[in-house]
């Protein structure tokens, strides 16, 4: 997955947990994968992992979480989790599945990336985060590639590149794929005058996982 993504062919892989694996074993396996491009589902088998991959691939809006998405063709699971094991798995980088009324669905889409440099890191935990990045960056690449073929690396062209990047980011913001974006910087490389460097930042839109109600009742 990482090799393909490094070659600008962004991919996400889905693997299944063993039918009898404990929460500790699943979290340990997720920790060994520790990749924002790998998803570990449990309970279930490779068929359910494939169904989860189909759900992920079939969702056209990268900001929409797969939470609650039904895995077609399945009516039961080999095990069920209560809230505590579910939270343990989510925190540990495991995507839990559940069966309700004869339908198997994804509880919450999580990647196996839980640490960076050995320290706990939630940055890439949500599956929507990497999906949004995989939507925004290729879209910008394609837009710039289409509009600036055979261009010169002049101040005027760099200004046009900056404007185009801002247009694309504003489109993503309007689509609610990103929440916001920061300053866009475009400059010629000091090492190679034929190279244009574009830098920008953006905040991804977050999925809604839970709603907590606090009722203040007056009688």
Map each language-model feature to its residues:
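A glycine- and small-residue-enriched flexible loop/hinge signal that marks low-structured segments
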Residues: 1-150, 161
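A generic structural signal for short, solvent-exposed coil/turn residues
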Residues: 4-6, 176-178, 190-192
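Generic structural hydrophobic/aromatic packing signal, biased to beta-strands
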Residues: 14, 136, 184-186, 198-200
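Anaerobic metallocofactor- and corrinoid-dependent redox/one-carbon enzyme cores
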Residues: 74, 181, 198
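Extended, compositionally biased non-globular segments
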Residues: 137-185
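C-terminal edge-of-domain segments
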Residues: 188-219
């Amino acid at each position: 997955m990482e090799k393909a993504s490094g070659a600008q062919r962004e991919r996400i892989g889905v693997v299944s947990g063993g039918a009898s694996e404990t929460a500790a074993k699943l979290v340990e396996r997720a920790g060994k994968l520790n990749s924002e491009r790998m998803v570990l589902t449990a309970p279930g088998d490779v068929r359910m992992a494939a169904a989860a991959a189909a759900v992920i691939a079939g969702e056209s809006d990268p900001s929409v979480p797969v939470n609650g998405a039904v895995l077609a063709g399945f009516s039961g699971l080999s095990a069920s989790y209560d809230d505590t094991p579910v939270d343990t798995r989510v925190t540990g980088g495991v995507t839990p599945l559940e069966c309700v009324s004869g339908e198997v669905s994804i509880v919450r889409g999580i990647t196996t990336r839980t640490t960076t440099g050995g320290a706990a890191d939630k940055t890439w935990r949500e599956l929507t985060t990497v999906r949004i990045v995989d939507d925004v960056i290729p879209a910008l690449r394609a837009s710039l590639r289409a509009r600036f073929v055979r261009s010169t690396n002049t101040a005027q062209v760099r200004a046009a590149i900056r404007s185009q990047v801002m247009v694309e980011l504003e489109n993503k913001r309007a689509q609610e794929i990103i929440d916001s974006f920061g300053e866009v910087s475009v400059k010629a490389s000091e090492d190679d005058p034929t190279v244009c460097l574009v830098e920008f930042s953006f905040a991804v839109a977050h999925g809604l996982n839970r709603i907590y109600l606090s009722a203040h009742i007056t009688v």
